[in-house]
């Protein structure tokens, strides 16, 4: 694979990740950590849920 092909592939992978990270940073766990909607905030008991600021 040429260098430009690798670069293009890397960019294609990074764009969705950064978009996802941006969306996730708009939400936070009850513990204060950023998270994505629908995730359990890394709490095995599932008590901490992901909430949108201002709600």
From Swiss-Prot:
It comes from Californiconus californicus (California cone). GO terms for molecular function: toxin activity. It comes from the Eukaryota. Keywords: Disulfide bond, Knottin, Neurotoxin, Secreted, Signal, Toxin. Residues 1-21 form the signal peptide. The keyword Nucleus does not apply. It is found in: Secreted. Expressed by the venom duct. The cysteine framework is VI/VII (C-C-CC-C-C). The keyword Transmembrane does not apply. Disulfide bonds join 24-36, 29-41, 35-50. This is Conotoxin Cal6.40. Probable neurotoxin. One of its GO terms (cellular component) is extracellular region. Its main location: secreted.
């Amino acid at each position: 694979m040429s260098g430009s092909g690798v670069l293009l592939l890397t960019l294609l992978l990074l764009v969705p990740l950064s978009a996802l990270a941006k969306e996730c940073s708009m939400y936070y766990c009850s513990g204060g950590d950023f998270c994505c909607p629908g995730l359990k905030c890394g709490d095995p008991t599932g008590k901490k849920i992901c909430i949108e600021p201002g709600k």
